[in-house]
Amino acid sequence: MASHIIGNRNSTPEASKSSLRPPSSSRNLATHQLRASADMSGFPSPLSSRSIRPASEVYFNQQAQTPGNAEDPLDRAAQQWLADIDQYETTLEEMAAATLDQDFKDELSAIEQWFRVLSEAERTAALYALLQQTTQVQIRFFIQVLQQMAKSHPMSGLLSPANFGEKGIDAMSNRLNDAMSKLNVDSSRNSLGRPPPSPGAKRNSGLDSSTINAMFPDAAAAIAKKKAEFTQQTGNAPPSNRNSAVFNERTSFVAPTISAPDNSADNLSQPPVSPWAQRGASEPQPPIARPKSSSGQQPMGQFNQSGLRSPLPTSQTATIPAPEIEAPLLSPYNVNASWASMTNTPMTATFGSQLGAPHQQGSDMVANATAMKLAALSTVNNRIALDDARKYRRARSNDGQGKNASNNTGAQSIQGGLASPGLPVAGQLLNAQQFAALQAQQQAAMAGHRSRPTSPGIAMQGGALGPMGFTSPQNNGFLTAYDPNNPLIGNGLGALGMGQFGLSGHEGYLSDHSEINRGRSPRGRRGSSKPPEDPTDPNLLKDIPSWLRSLRLHKYTDNLKDLKWTELIELNDKQLEERGVNALGARNKMLKVFEQVKEAKAEGKLDNATA
């Protein structure tokens, strides 16, 4: 019976491919015709064309669309070319508009001043670190600009091998263009790809094309070259009003190909996703556009991976504790103003993602504070004065001891009233009046104009003698200009009026600081109490070199020895500067002595000198 049932299972016709009839059970042969009449294997099965392995409907739709898109590669290449040209022009317009922004110009000026003082190796390292943050579109843009700059440079033909510009650069450019064209969106993502260009969409830039070309000549030349290549290969010039986006207003710095749609209900007004970064529609993507200075922005430049030095390490969720020490305003570790002066600005949120929106506001404040600080430091007499960083490292490593030592030093400075031309120690800040006084003292010291103290007794410039310590400021980390009257230099004798005790102080113009260090009297002194020689002495006026030596102005003998004293006293400030008397203090002293000689001449005291 079992063999009979097995034989009846294959009782369908030979031509049939499949059957929907259930398997036979323990029925007899009388039901065989009934089973045959119910067999539907003669009808074509709707699943007969399906292969053994199932596939999705998307795959069949892609196969169905493929034969009708035979000319798509050429069309897509032309569209990509037009989009690239349009994207370069858009980038150029936005760059020109950003360059005219006053806030951006101020920040850029501060960055350029910082960049100008770097060495060539440091500049190369900085540029290399910045290039690590560029996108693919920016890389292509920079390649075009650098190629144009290299071809226009007069030394490129001498430094490059023969025909490198024709073979090497063009070959690299062709390979790059081929590689970028292969990264285009496939036909399955045409719905999210680049929308068709709308010829009616005009640019909203208010800048003239000649202005943009004048601001960026190399980039404009690269774009013109691209247009010429497109015209040569296609025979049609690219339209000037082409816009690669569906929306009318340009709200981004870059073309729509490097932006992602936001999480909104209507995605038609948003630019399409980037073909180079395969992200989902719901996955957030940070904007690549650089907003204005007043808006929130992502910080740029994680330079630690590029080999640049950083004072403090940075991490994704680092918490920076506030040190106990109160640092001065111009300290390189100024923890009171902003941590941007201590660390490189990270690419991602330094304080974690839990802060959310306040981080963007904080990063904006950090960027503005950094720009303002750079601008302020670069405009203080065109020099930047910073405290020594080693002092703060010692204070930070020894916590309490370093703080107490710094405070004690500051207390001594306040009690003693020492007028140091350098910056104060930790914990003491300068106000505007103190800083102006220190600047005036430094300028007077550099000019060399000092007057002898005329007050009776011990006349000390700056305060009492009690808490003054005769130590070198350089050992304490001061960055000071050399001041001969500073109580901390030269054992403090330069600031004391010691004439009554047999120790002569220096009067008038100090021409050589070595006179203080060696402890000898300036040339022309014959005794500690004898005043300098009279500048109106007729015998001295006949000998200009000796006369200048008596005034401690003998370094200008070669500039003035060809003049008679009658001609010399008629010179004004501008004429003295033209003759090489560059020091302001020397010119002022000469003019003052000239007036004395003129008065003596008017009184008839110099009749012997004119004879």
Swiss-Prot record:
Compositionally biased tracts (Polar residues): 230-246, 260-271, 292-318, 398-415
Record field: compositional bias (Low complexity): 16-27
Pfam families: SAM_2, Vts1
Record CDD domains: SAM_VTS1_fungal
Alphabetically ordered keywords of this record: Cytoplasm, Nucleotide-binding, Protein transport, RNA-binding, Transport
Basic and acidic residues bias spans: 509-518
PANTHER family registered for this protein in UniProt: PROTEIN SMAUG, STERILE ALPHA MOTIF DOMAIN CONTAINING PROTEIN 4-RELATED
Assembly and binders: Monomer. Binds to RNA.
Family designation: Belongs to the VTS1 family.
Record-given protein name: RNA-binding protein vts1
Lineage: Eukaryota, Fungi, Dikarya, Ascomycota, Pezizomycotina
Underlying gene: vts1
